[in-house]
Each structure stands twice: as C-alpha cells, then as structure tokens.
C-alpha cells in the first residue's frame, strides 16, 4: 500500500501530470512523469497515481492490477525526487502480466525518462 502522503488524490494533479508530463509507453503500462520545479509541499515527497480503466477487465481484475502496480510503485518511491508526480496507466495486457514484469516495465520507463522532465 502506498503511504497517504505519496498518493495522488486530486483530479487536477492527474490532469496536470498527464497533460504536461513526459510520456513513456511499454507493452502493459503507460507512464507519465512530471517533475515540478516548485512543488506545493516539498516534505510530502513524490506522488503516484494509478489509472486502471474498464478495458483492463472486470472489477476484480482491475483491482488486482491496481494492487500490483501500487506494490511496484511503493518499491520505487526512494528513486523518485520529492517533486515528482507519476501517473501509471494500466493497459489491457497488464491483466495477465506478473508483478515482476510490471516492475521491470516501470523501471525501464523511469530510466528512459529525460532528466529535466516537466515544464
């Protein structure tokens, strides 16, 4: 489970990250990363949001994918800057992907992101 301070909860945060952040795609996920130059609250740390749409599958399957992605994202919190905003969008293939594969894809996306990501 992601700590509350690291969860993206407002739709405005999601929208800004998806609209102004850098996008990187993998077979099972799409990652949007936005690095704020002046974050609202520096002590809060990085924030992560998940988007798991109905195309992924039934409610049970979507929740299973969301739990896996939360677990993977929590392990990577230490590698993110405090000002980072990260949105992970699950694609239909994520339903059958293992947690290890999702972790590998997320790490690959973060490694490939340019250094000065964001506005």
Curated annotation (Swiss-Prot):
Catalysed reactions, semicolon-separated: Endonucleolytic cleavage of RNA, removing 5'-extranucleotides from tRNA precursor
Class of the enzyme per the UniProt entry, highest EC level: hydrolase
Gene3D superfamilies: 3.30.230.10
SUPFAM superfamilies with a match to the protein in the record: Ribosomal protein S5 domain 2-like
Name of the protein described by the UniProt record: Ribonuclease P protein component
Family, similarity comment: Belongs to the RnpA family.
UniProt keyword annotation of tRNA processing present: yes
EC numbers: 3.1.26.5
PANTHER family per record: RIBONUCLEASE P PROTEIN COMPONENT
Signal peptide: none
Keywords for the protein's UniProt record, in alphabetical order: Endonuclease, Hydrolase, Nuclease, RNA-binding, tRNA processing
Function: RNaseP catalyzes the removal of the 5'-leader sequence from pre-tRNA to produce the mature 5'-terminus. It can also cleave other RNA substrates such as 4.5S RNA. The protein component plays an auxiliary but essential role in vivo by binding to the 5'-leader sequence and broadening the substrate specificity of the ribozyme.
Organism: Mycobacterium avium (strain 104)
